[in-house]
Amino acid sequence: MTTAILRRTAAQLFMVGLPGPTLEPATRRFLVDHPPGGVILFKRNVRSGAQLRRLIGEIHATGAGVSPLVAIDHEGGRVHRLPRPFTHFPPAAVLGAHRDVGLAEAVGRAMGRELRAVGSISPSRPCSTSARTPAIA
């Protein structure tokens, strides 16, 4: 295996963040030269739904045959990245307190529809591994 192939393969194991709301030439070049397995977006990357849709399209266009997974740090509650008119979902702790699987599934589906509309396939959600904290606030 050549060094170049090894580097490209290793890069696919990483999920990277971007510095801002646009794909600047240096960032685009980095994504082309070292295509990551995923890109995670944060508040600094989001201005509007239309801008986010364009940014995600540009991210996908950098992939050399394989588009990176695009996730957003959008958990509900205080961690809400999408501007109006997107729904402000409750935190996981509130959903968990209801102990209603149907409600949690409905919220997850609604969040998924909104994220899919801008081209992101996944919210970034924390997972609790402690019996004392069955849901994350």
Regions from the language model: what does each represent?
Residues 18-23, 103, 107:
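Short secondary-structure boundary/capping elements
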Residues 7-9, 32-35:
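Flexible, charged surface loops at secondary-structure boundaries
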Residues 1-22:
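Boundary/entry segment of secreted carbohydrate-active catalytic domains
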Residues 1-4, 30, 85:
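A broad, low-specificity signal for short, low-complexity segments enriched in glycine/proline
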Residues 33-137:
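Enzymes and membrane/adaptor proteins characterized by extended Gly/Ser/Thr/Asp/Glu-rich
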Residues 2-3, 25-27, 57:
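A generic local structural motif
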